[in-house]
Structure formats: structure tokens, C-alpha cells
Amino acid sequence: MGSAQLPLQTKGIFHSLPTFSPDVKALTAIVTGANGISGFHTMRVLLESPKRWEKIWAVSRRPPPEEMMALLPEDARQRVEHVACDFLSAPEDIAKQLKDKGVTADAIFFYSYAQPRPEPGAPVWSNAEELLDTNCERST
């Protein structure tokens, strides 16, 4: 199917999203950093398509706060399951946590990152290079 049949769309803060064929159904997604701004909004967009995205695994150290989950309709909340996972742990420990919960996925949306402490008195993003180095090192 070409782009004429599946045009791009905008959903909230997300632009140029593809439109997917309605034939694709019952997918499962992992959203890491699900209690952050980008992770939570990605989860909201996925949950707007209940036939396509049957289950969302919200993977983060803490579950999304109740105030955030209250923004979702009840039927959407029923399709979200939190998995407590610290991505600073050893890869074997992360794998065990996911496996023990029975997590499987058709797609992964990765929004987790480690924020190094800035120098005292410096703005939070003043150590952008250290932020990049820390997170690139964790993902290799």
C-alpha cells in the first residue's frame, strides 16, 4: 500500500505519524520511561487504537503516577501493565525482570535515560555531553 492510501497524521505533540492498515491487529508494545513526558504520551497515542495495540507494557522504575493514569479512559488503563525495571541494572537482571513478568512485544518505544548530576549551581542540561556519553555507553 502506498502513501496515498496511508497518509501521515498528527496526534497531540506527535507529527508526521504514519497511518497504519486496519488489518494489523492485536499487537503488544513495550514503552520504557512510561512515566516520563514522551513515554506517557506515546502510550496514550498507542492506547487510542485498541484493536491495533492490545497490550502496553509500561516499563520504568516506578509506575506512572495515578494523576497521569487518570487521564486515560478506564478501558485503556486495563490494557496497561507496569513492569518495575531499573535500566541502570545489569542486562541479565533486566532480562530476568521482563521474562519473569512474561513480557513479549511486537514493538519497543524506548524513552529511558540516565540523567547525570550537573555541577552545583549549573542548569540541568549544562552537562549535555556527559548525558550523551552516559546513555550511549549504557546502550552498547
Report each predicted region and the residues it spans.
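Conserved internal alpha-helix within the Rossmann fold of NAD(P)-dependent oxidoreductases
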Residues: 139-140
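N-terminal Rossmann-fold cofactor-binding loop
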Residues: 59-63, 87
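N-terminal Rossmann NAD(P)H-binding glycine-rich loop of SDR-like oxidoreductase domains
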Residues: 5-52
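SDR active-site strand-loop-helix element
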Residues: 32, 59, 109-113
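Conserved beta-strand positions in the Rossmann-like core of class I SAM-dependent methyltransferases
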Residues: 54-57
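NAD(P)H-binding glycine-rich loop region in Rossmannoid oxidoreductase-like domains
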Residues: 68, 74-135
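Universal eukaryotic N-terminal targeting presequences
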Residues: 1-2
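Short, solvent-exposed loop/turn segments at secondary-structure junctions
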Residues: 36-37, 63-64, 114-117
